[in-house]
């Protein structure tokens, strides 16, 4: 995401959309009665015919729809302004926002926490492709803020099938991996697996992709369980420290360890966490993003809490439904805080 302009007087932010993560964030921050200015198309009657006409409109937002990994955000609302010759003011309309588009978002008042989220998103540039490989299977995935997208999950030909099968299988993986690298243009590749096969794959990848950074790591299997394992590793933090999905999993693991050994350093529940924030005791808070889409009063309360945490140098991690820790956190009321010190 690029922030092209912020007009404080109009409370208008102009953005250029660069990734699915950007669309996901806009889905979270767009609220009913916000206004958006964007290019769109609409069927317009021209005599006896109708044609789909491109135009720029102002839309008063009703609600948004986002389906992860579709590269599109649908913004539903009422047309507040459009070229008069088309006579469509007041009509219902849906703007399809895609990667590469620009949009202006106008709010009555931009919340500092939400603006800071936009700025953090604009500073995110790193992306990594993860390939887990073993002699008989492999998995290729890419992390987004809203979850992990599995790009490929396949079995390989058995080792006893023919001579040179290890090299052939390594080339098969490397060739497919190279295609995904061209598509997603990651900053780095993480190759992980239980044996030496990952080194064979790395050689083939290096032969195809000359200037792409490759990290090697060990993992127990080339499966989804192995993927969950590698997401908790320090190597992931090293490569993509700004991806909350990896950080969130590690923080949740820390919270569970503290609950077992030092439960006084963890609290959960809206009122309990709010109390801890007021005392300046919160080091990290994890919150499911559903709570930011709940009724207006609760959402405003949570937004103020999160802003207060960051003002006191605490860390906020928003957990989407696609996160591996989502249901675990939801079962703990949806909001949990790791504390700097014990409180009553």
Swiss-Prot record:
NCBIfam families from the UniProt entry: pelota
PANTHER family in UniProt: PELOTA, PROTEIN PELOTA HOMOLOG
Gene that encodes the chain: pelA
Function, in words: May function in recognizing stalled ribosomes, interact with stem-loop structures in stalled mRNA molecules, and effect endonucleolytic cleavage of the mRNA. May play a role in the release non-functional ribosomes and degradation of damaged mRNAs. Has endoribonuclease activity.
Subunit details: Monomer.
Broad EC category: hydrolase
Entry note about domains: The N-terminal domain has the RNA-binding Sm fold. It harbors the endoribonuclease activity.
Cofactor or coenzyme needed: a divalent metal cation
Protein name per its UniProtKB record: Protein pelota homolog
UniProtKB keywords: Cytoplasm, Endonuclease, Hydrolase, Metal-binding, Nuclease
Protein location: Cytoplasm
Major location (coarse): cytoplasm
Key word Ion transport present: no
EC numbers on record: 3.1.-.-
Family classification: Belongs to the eukaryotic release factor 1 family. Pelota subfamily.
Taxonomic superkingdom: Archaea
GO biological process: nonfunctional rRNA decay; nuclear-transcribed mRNA catabolic process, no-go decay; nuclear-transcribed mRNA catabolic process, non-stop decay; ribosome disassembly; RNA surveillance
